[in-house]
Amino acid sequence: SYGGYAALVAASRSPNAYQCVIAGAAVTDPQMQVDYYRYRLRGSSKLEQLAMWDDSISPLTEVDKVNVPVLLIHGDVDQRVPVDHAEKYLAKLVDAKKQHTYVELEGADHFSNTLFYNHKTLLYSSILNYLADECGLENGMMPATSPTKIEPKVAQQP
């Protein structure tokens, strides 16, 4: 969530500072996240932790400055950072005609230990394909000479 947020903020910084960014379950609207937690944590002592978002940059307001391809990944039942964040950011990317890829993990929550085999297969194959196609990296490490497509195989849950 914070790593995804940081990636999206980085995507709008100095041109060519990065080749591309991958944002998983990113907070795209800090105020929306604060409101979400205030509703969920009514009266909780954890409310003080929300102060970190008070002066945060909103990636939503920075989309016009995005200067690298963006891979946005989000689970559609994320309990920590609602998928609304991804949907709002995706709409802004489309409106601004920014290069992007969106992968929504159906039935996936926020944390990797809640992902099933089919989620992980789609997640990792999407990342590898994105790195090869959009970032010029093969296998996520070296410049691509001839990118190899990895087709995700989705396993059926019993």
Which ranges hold each PLM region?
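Active-site-proximal cap/loop segments of hydrolase catalytic domains
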Residues: 1-158
